[in-house]
Amino acid sequence: MNAQLDGLSVSSSSTGSLGSAAAAAGGGGGAGLRLLSANVRQLHQALTALLSEPEREQFTHCLNAYHARRNVFDLVRTLRVLLDSPVKRRLLPMLRLVIPRSDQLLFDQYTAEGLYLPATTPYRQPAWAAPDGAGPGEVRLVSLRRAKAHEGLGFSIRGGSEHGVGIYVSLVEPGSLAEKEGLRVGDQILRVNDKSLARVTHAEAVKALKGSKKLVLSVYSAGRIPGGYVTNHIYTWVDPQGRSTSPPSSLPQPHGSTLRQREDDRRSTLHLLQSGDEKKVNLVLGDGRSLGLTIRGGAEYGLGIYITGVDPGSEAESSGLKVGDQILEVNGRSFLNILHDEAVKLLKSSRHLILTVKDVGRLPHARTTVDQTKWIASSRIGESVANSAGFPGDHTEEGTSKPGFYKGPAGSQVTLSSLGNQTRALLDDQARHLLTEQERATMMYYLAQYRGGTISVEAMVMALFELLNTHAKFSLLSEVRSIISPQDLDRFDHLVLRREIESMKARQPPGPGVGDTYSMVSYSDTGSSTGSHGTSTTVSSARERLLWLIDLMENTLDLEGTGETTQGSTNALPDVSVDDVKSPSEDLPGIKPPPPPPPLAQGHDRLLGQPRKPGREDPAPLSSAAHSGIVFSAPRNRSPPPGTAPTPGPSSAQDSPSSPIYASISHANPSSRKPLDTHLALVNQHPIGPFPRVQSPPHLKSPPAETPGAGACLPPPSPSEHPDAVGANQHFVLVEVHRPDSEPDVNEVRALPQTRTASTLSQLSDSGQTLSEDSGVDAGETEASTSGRGRQTASAKNKNGKEQPRTERTAEGANKPPGLLEPTSTLVRVRKSAATLGIAIEGGANTRQPLPRIVTIQRGGSAHNCGQLKVGHVILEVNGQTLRGKEHKEAARIIAEAFKTKERDYIDFLVTEFNVML
């Protein structure tokens, strides 16, 4: 191919666009003013030879998106759709040469997962090539004609370009027209009435199949259908200075969230103990001596235990332990396959420690979830359906362990065996990010009432509509759908779809003279067609879902009358019957289910106020979530601390790992700790009217002196009193979009990390999910160790300062039903105590959330250290500047500039917990 490419000529017009885009991917700017490198020229020639003009434009857009966000994972996922043949995939090695060297390792890891290896099976090749009739004698024609307008065709389909696969026949009803004409399960539909189904979404395929009485299908006998997904976790690794590096040698890539092996097998498998690799360290901790370790990892993450921080002057430093060492054994107990909490307990249990460590010289930094499609042979589908018993007239359960569910004809839901616990855990995980404790308890109450048969699906949905009253909260319905009974699924989909259509109509402009309020929602890029579909995420992205709804509104009959259903977002490819079966629309009942018991309200607002014990922090979520409303890339789960009031129904807090990937281990006597209140905010609350005023009263900016004694936080001392506050005014702020497949009105405001030292690993925001903050393993709080552990002492600083605050608000909220709090505004002063602010916001003017709302608080950032900001807060003002009328980007810029300015070492946020749209 190189010889072929060398002889190609490059037009000047296309060279400018593609060449500059490729140069941009390599980090260059102003490519038109300098000569292109040989690698860029070779890539451009290959693009000209292998891709059409529209494909080259998509490729250019893909590179521009990567250059703007530096998200390697999304770059590779997007290329999966574009480079749809082995010949086109030859562009990947050329592209690798023009991306920054620091991203090449991650690029290699993602492509090594098998996503873009040349197809080796007879099934993969026709997925995109067969639409042109390239199948070796396997393509055949199937003609279907409806006798009546509403007669069903008798088959269901699965797949779509948003899942990276073609359109496949997943079910054929016995005795149906499709069966009589020879359509079989496992057939791939290539064309419908001369319309190609290559690279079409699932919704587009459904519309093409339902748009005509007579169908001539070109099908390919693939003999299989796409099933669920296998989730692989890829870790990025850094050296002790925080620079990206390659993984340790002989470290296998995990093919799941855990690696459960016997310790002796794991030892031999990882080849960790080679000659001269390990050393023994004998530690005897005297009185007042600090162990001073920060550890990371655990068996629940498929990792060993690594040292990520060593305090200056500690016993660990004196014994030669350093950042980048892996702990293999402690007092005879292997650390190769030990849970994180067990490692913490063992390191705290004795003052005489004999450690076996290995100098690995690198650390796991961030984990990204990569999903691989699992295929189900059509023969297995037939056997499992024949051997299963189901409801009369409905299709039955499929005998496979693939996680997730898919939808059968006439609204029947084919539930897979491992769905129940997993979907409940996913729902609970997403609810922690979007809802307060009271709201989460309210939702679980209604779900429990529905599952127990106390209320109908209509009553439950109407109650959830009242509770999930913002766009982000509404996205939880995609997870709620997974626990709906099969017989209620059609009704649930119809109600949700009608609500979404009503919401969109309400937001439409009154006339053509008004700007398009959907411009940022309907903005389409290549990355939007590859929604996240891991085992702990949902399939469709917000943009895809809204575009589909808009398309249905413009091109189909009145959906409110026909009762057509939406495709739920699941972690397996959904089936949709292509039959035009009309479901009569039923009037919604006017009854409302009773509210949940009020005692749950006493647990409200204790999430941030509850003192935490070192070593018992929350685990990092397995992956970021993609919803119909918004995509979150939260670094940590927010589960209630011990002592929080239980929620009704079975709690899934124990379903996920309860141990963090980092821990703080301390031998310190609690009575000897000094109160550390450096990062506590100064809070002053006052009631406001039904709609909060954005203008802040002048006295809020200068709180009275007696405020600290009234139960609020003490004012932070001057930076000179605490060594860890030195240099707090040196910040560089970056505002970036979370993920290219998320809604464009979600920005993360954070600062670039400052200079890193060898003793502590700084947290970087990578293309994958950033793991949680490091915490310390120490034997005593000393001033010397405090100066070397800025992030490690964050939990200790909040321990004593959070015993008292928020009790008045907790008692006040106990008298109100969950989710119905009286609006109050709060002034929160956030000290610039870290290199990052660490919050992500959604909303802004001209959106469903008119004022910015906090959706993520990153651990280790200034907002987290403050302890008073929390997820769900609506930001009214920043340093006295109102955010009313500010669009999302403008609001994000205001927050970023407030953090960047050197005029003050804090930011004043006026926030509210008001639960309705302002």
From Swiss-Prot:
UniProt GO BP: auditory receptor cell stereocilium organization; cerebellar Purkinje cell layer formation; detection of mechanical stimulus involved in sensory perception of sound; establishment of localization in cell; establishment of protein localization; inner ear receptor cell differentiation; inner ear receptor cell stereocilium organization; paranodal junction maintenance
InterPro entries: PDZ, PDZ_sf, USH2_Complex_Protein, Whirlin_HN-like_dom1, Whirlin_HN-like_dom2
Pro residues biased stretches: 591-600, 638-649
Entry's Gene Ontology cellular component terms: actin filament; ciliary basal body; cilium; cytosol; growth cone; neuron projection; periciliary membrane compartment; photoreceptor connecting cilium
Compositional bias segments (type: Polar residues): 563-572, 654-672, 754-773, 783-798
Tissue distribution of the protein: Expressed in the retina. Colocalizes with RPGR in the photoreceptor connecting cilium, a thin bridge linking the cell body and the light-sensing outer segment (at protein level). Detected in the inner ear throughout development from embryonic day 12 to 20 days after birth. Displays a dynamic pattern of expression after birth, demonstrating an ordered appearance and fade-out across stereocilia rows. Isoforms 5, 6, 7 and 8 are not detected in the retina.
Gene Ontology molecular functions: identical protein binding
Region of interest (Disordered), residue spans: 240-266, 387-407, 503-538, 560-824
Modified residues annotated as Phosphoserine in this record: 696
Null mutant phenotype: Mutant mice for isoform 1 appear viable and comparable to their wild-type littermates in growth characteristics, reproductive performance and general health. At 2 and 9 months of age, knockouts show a profound hearing loss across all cochlear frequencies. At 28 to 33 months, they show signs for retinal degeneration such as a thinner photoreceptor nuclear layer and outer segments shortened.
Residue stretches of biased makeup (Basic and acidic residues): 800-811
Biased composition (Low complexity): 522-538
Record domain PDZ: where: 141-224, 280-362, 827-910
Segments passing through the bilayer: none
Function text: Involved in hearing and vision as member of the USH2 complex. Necessary for elongation and maintenance of inner and outer hair cell stereocilia in the organ of Corti in the inner ear. Involved in the maintenance of the hair bundle ankle region, which connects stereocilia in cochlear hair cells of the inner ear. In retina photoreceptors, required for the maintenance of periciliary membrane complex that seems to play a role in regulating intracellular protein transport.
Protein name: Whirlin
